[in-house]
Amino acid sequence: MKYSGYHLVIDLFGCNFDQLENTEYMIEMLKKLAEALDTTIIAKAFHKFHPQGFSGALIISESHITIHTWPEDAYIGIDIFTCSKCFDSRKIVAYLKENLIFKKAEIKEILRGKID
């Protein structure tokens, strides 16, 4: 069975408030995630919300990586969508554990665009 894309949806709970509010750190962490996944960044956009929260998007040649934070809820939502390769979600969670403080991760792997 062939698919057009692979979508990884990551929900992180019990995240550290101060880390979520450190916009520069979150931007660098997201860029390094793209590098760790061996993807090519072609565009990026980041927005700091007031009084708190952050959203970021990396357009990669393979598709996109996005992050949204809710410091008041100690929550991060990350999406990784690619049209070229599947990723080992365990390696991604290991990377996130090395770079973010959180208590619980929920991951959904979605195969997109089934081709007959």
Curated annotation (Swiss-Prot):
Listed Gene3D superfamilies: S-adenosylmethionine decarboxylase
EC number(s) from the headed UniProt entry: 4.1.1.50
Superkingdom, taxonomy of origin: Bacteria
InterPro entries: AdoMetDC_fam_prok, S-AdoMet_deCO2ase_core, S-AdoMet_deCOase_pro-enz
Pathways per UniProt: Amine and polyamine biosynthesis; S-adenosylmethioninamine biosynthesis; S-adenosylmethioninamine from S-adenosyl-L-methionine: step 1/1
Purpose of the protein: Catalyzes the decarboxylation of S-adenosylmethionine to S-adenosylmethioninamine (dcAdoMet), the propylamine donor required for the synthesis of the polyamines spermine and spermidine from the diamine putrescine.
Protein name, per record: S-adenosylmethionine decarboxylase proenzyme
Species per Swiss-Prot/TrEMBL record: Clostridium botulinum (strain Loch Maree / Type A3)
Biological classification of the source: Bacteria, Bacillati, Bacillota, Clostridia, Eubacteriales
Gene, per the UniProt record: speH
